[in-house]
Amino acid sequence: MKTYAIGDLHGRFQPVRDFHLRHNTEKEYNKADKFLILLGDSGLNYYLDSRDKTFKKKLSKYPFTYFVVRGNHEERASNIARNNPDWQFENFWGGIVLVEKEFPNIKYAMDYPAFYNIPYIGNHEHDLTYIWRALVIPGAYSVDKDYRLAMGYSWFKDEQLTEEEKDVCLKDIEDAHYKCDFILSHTCPCVFEPTDLFLPMIDQSTVDKSMEQFLGYIEFLMDYDCWLWGHYHKFRDYPRTDGKKKIMLMHEVIDLEQVYKEDTVEVL
């Protein structure tokens, strides 16, 4: 059993294909059940037409069960599933996910913050399974919202968390005693925003930072081992001044077990 994570795909299957081709001759890779966490803006529910289905079919060629964290450039799975018999709820990783019947290997995390139990082999000699407790926080603000609206491109009005969803998250982390192993999100706490990557044509005074500020509060409250996010289209392994691992991903793939156990991050 192996669990990996990757950042934004934006409808491109090639990073997944290339990762698989780099490792499909390895014995350990081939014998393991493989899970791939997509950290938002995957492009699976972007066009809401046959183009999405084509992308899902391409991803389904590869031997992964996908766990999808919602970003900002995609529709909420719960909106698509509403009154749609082709979608159903499932129990997965100790939580609830949405699944489209045609693509049972693609599991969509809830559109609100939720905890999941990610299984891993903690003792390979005796094949003993343990779990990581993971807090999943979806959503982000689209800095190119006005451009998208002007050009007729997709923009999703409920891309960010609602205040009610944030309140539920705060209650959930209190119930969890403010502790988990992983935090998985699309955007990141405000203190970790890569300002050097901000688009120069965007007036930052017009950007809604409420999601990043909320995540900053979560970061202050939570005792965690590793936080993974995407959104900014760059790989970055942040300094660990407090001992916590903070990793930003784009097309890079990482192994959660390696990241959890070791001080360095190996890009696969």
Tell me the role of every PLM-derived stretch.
Residues H10-G11, G43-N45, H73-E75, G139-V143, ...:
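Short, solvent-exposed loop/turn segments at secondary-structure junctions
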Residues M1, K31-D33, P63, T129-I131, ...:
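A general structural motif
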Residues I6, R12-L128, Q204, S210-E212, ...:
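Core catalytic region of metal-dependent phosphoesterases/phosphodiesterases
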Residues G43-L44, T54-K56, F67, D181-G230:
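Cap/insert and terminal regions of metallo-dependent hydrolase folds
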